[in-house]
Curated annotation (Swiss-Prot):
PANTHER family: ATP-DEPENDENT PROTEASE SUBUNIT HSLV, METALLOPROTEASE TLDD
Protein name as annotated: ATP-dependent protease subunit HslV
Xref: SUPFAM superfamilies: N-terminal nucleophile aminohydrolases (Ntn hydrolases) (SSF56235)
Example of a GO cellular component annotation carried by this entry: proteasome core complex
Signal peptide: none
Keyword Protease: yes
GO biological process: proteolysis involved in protein catabolic process
Active site residues per record: 6
Gene of this entry: hslV
Binding site for Na(+): 164, 167, 170
Length: 182
C-alpha cells in the first residue's frame, strides 16, 4: 500500500512511548489541510494509535480496535490480541477488506503495525513508521536512537522533521502524544 500525504512514527525509549504524525492532508495534488491530527489516545490514554490512509477508514479501524480490546471483558489490555483479531476481521470481512489505511498502535509495552493484508508486525527495534515518509522517518529514528541523551519525544520530533525535509507528501506540522511505560 502506498499512501501519500502522511508520516506516522512510534518510538519506545527511556520509559516513554511516543506516537507522532505530520499534519498534511492531500486531495489529489492539492494540500487541503496542513494541521490534521492523525493520532488518537484510546482507552483513557493507555493506548496511542496513528494512521496513514483514508481518514474515515482509519476512524472505523480505531473504533473496531477499541471494540476488540473491550470485548475481552476482563479489564486487561492486550493490544497484541486485539491487533491480531482486528487484522483477521480486516482481511476477511467484505466491508472492512475495502478499507484503505494502515495503523500503528502502542501501549506502555508494545508497538505494533496493523495492515489490511492481515499483517501485525512488532518491530525488532523500538521504532516503526508508516506512510509516504515512513522510510525516511524510520531511518532517521534508528540513527537518533543511538544518542542516549535524546528522549523518545525528541527522537520522534527530529525524525519527522527529517522526513518533512525530503518527502513532498509530509509536512512539519507535527503532533506528538506520549505515555509513560509501566
Amino acid at each position: 500500500m502506498g499512501f501519500k500525504g502522511t508520516t506516522v512514527i512510534a518510538i519506545k525509549k527511556n520509559g516513554k512511548t511516543v506516537v507522532a504524525a505530520d499534519g498534511q492532508v492531500l486531495f489529489g495534488h492539492t494540500v487541503l489541510k496542513s494541521n490534521a491530527i492523525k493520532i488518537r489516545k484510546l482507552l483513557n490514554g493507555k493506548i496511542l494509535a496513528g494512521f496513514a490512509g483514508s481518514t474515515s477508514d482509519a476512524i472505523t479501524l480505531f473504533e473496531k480496535f477499541e471494540e476488540k480490546i473491550k470485548a475481552k471483558g476482563d479489564g486487561l489490555i492486550d493490544i497484541k490480541r486485539a491487533a491480531v483479531d482486528l487484522a483477521k476481521d480486516w482481511r476477511s470481512d467484505k466491508i472492512l477488506h475495502k478499507l484503505e489505511a494502515m495503523m500503528l498502535v502502542a501501549d506502555s509495552k508494545n508497538i505494533l503495525l496493523i495492515s489490511g493484508t492481515g499483517d501485525v508486525v512488532e518491530p525488532e527495534e523500538d521504532v516503526i513508521s508508516i506512510g509516504s515518509g515512513g522510510n525516511y522517518a524510520y531511518s532517521a529514528a534508528l540513527a537518533y536512537m543511538e544518542n542516549k541523551k535524546l528522549s523518545a519525544f525528541e527522537v520522534a520530533l527530529r525524525s519527522l522533521k527529517i522526513a518533512a525535509r525530503v518527502c513532498i507528501y509530509t509536512n512539519s506540522n507535527i503532533v506528538l502524544e506520549e505515555i509513560e511505560n509501566e
